[in-house]
């Protein structure tokens, strides 16, 4: 192991301090009176045990703070790297899907199918009430066709950046809720809407969509039975179990979540449509 120059300097400095301390002890033993007079004459009082204890405590605290800062920096770096890996895995799945569809490298039209997801921030006391802050829509091939940051009417008390990925800086390019509603409604008109937990997203958008044109991965029977024990499985769990990819490592992205929901639908499209047709044919009867 090769020691750094800083470490070498520190070692030498420590050796000098030890020798100086030993020399001071030797002087004190040989002539205690002289040492005491010298200290008082110089105007520097002898260091008390309490003072030494205080210095040691301060030093220990500083070491702990430095260690915590290093760990936090490493955690942020690891999280950022993990998010990039996850994003790359999802994009690769989308690329493969497009290649199999013969759409690789092409920017297609919106088409009949779209997938949507939203992100929210907190307002009110402690930021517990959710309001819309971003809405993203992708086409059947995972291409982004709409991505809007939405300016909340209320004062944001919790940006939830750690999960939403949204910061105050994003509001510089944000649109009003009314504009977002208008553009999303136009995008969804006469199209099949895919997503995960769409009831909540549509409710927060205050936009309606015909149930016959909704494909919600959170409500898909086979997914609920196999991965949720009859309950609603999370998008994160379905992505891991069905698509073999990890998403939402830390900060969420509505574009990525919309793409994940789209791939989940396409992974079991035949069964999705069979069950959907069965459900709505009963209603008509």
Curated annotation (Swiss-Prot):
GO molecular function, one term: exonuclease activity
Subcellular location: Nucleus
Keyword vocabulary terms for this entry: Exonuclease, Hydrolase, Nuclease, Nucleus, rRNA processing
Residue span of region Disordered: 1-59
Pfam families reported in the protein's UniProt record: RNase_T
Any single GO BP term: RNA processing
Domain (Exonuclease) ranges: 113-265
Compositional bias annotation for Polar residues: 1-11
Gene Ontology cellular-component terms listed: nucleus
Top-level EC class as recorded in UniProt: hydrolase
Family: Belongs to the REXO4 family.
Functional note: Exoribonuclease involved in ribosome biosynthesis. Involved in the processing of ITS1, the internal transcribed spacer localized between the 18S and 5.8S rRNAs.
Protein name: RNA exonuclease 4
Source organism: Eremothecium gossypii (strain ATCC 10895 / CBS 109.51 / FGSC 9923 / NRRL Y-1056) (Yeast)
């Amino acid at each position: 192991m090769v020691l750094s120059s800083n470490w070498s300097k520190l070692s030498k400095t420590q050796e000098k301090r030890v020798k100086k301390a030993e020399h001071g002890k030797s002087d004190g033993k040989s002539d205690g009176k002289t040492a005491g007079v010298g200290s008082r004459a110089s105007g520097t009082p002898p260091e008390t045990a309490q003072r030494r204890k205080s210095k040691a405590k301060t030093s220990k605290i500083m070491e702990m703070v430095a260690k915590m800062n290093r760990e936090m920096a490493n955690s942020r770096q690891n999280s950022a790297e993990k998010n990039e890996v996850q994003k790359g895995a999802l994009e690769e799945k989308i690329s493969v899907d497009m290649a199999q569809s013969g759409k690789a490298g092409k920017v297609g039209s919106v088409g009949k199918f779209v997938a949507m997801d939203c992100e929210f921030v907190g307002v009110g006391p402690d930021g517990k009430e959710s309001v819309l802050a971003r809405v993203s829509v992708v086409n059947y091939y995972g291409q982004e066709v709409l991505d809007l940051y939405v300016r909340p009417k209320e004062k944001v008390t919790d940006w939830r950046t750690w999960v939403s990925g949204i910061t105050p800086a994003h509001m510089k390019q944000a649109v009003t809720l009314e504009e977002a509603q208008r553009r999303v409604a136009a995008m969804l008109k006469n199209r099949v809407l895919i997503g995960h937990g769409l009831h909540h997203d549509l409710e927060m958008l205050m936009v309606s969509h015909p149930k016959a044109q909704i494909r919600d991965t959170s409500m898909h029977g086979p997914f609920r039975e196999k991965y949720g024990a009859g309950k609603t499985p999370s998008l994160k769990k379905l992505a891991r179990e069905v698509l073999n990819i990890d998403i939402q490592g830390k900060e969420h992205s509505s574009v990525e979540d919309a793409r994940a929901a789209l791939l989940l639908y396409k992974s079991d499209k035949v069964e999705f449509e069979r069950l959907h047709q069965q459900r709505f044919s009963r209603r008509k009867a």
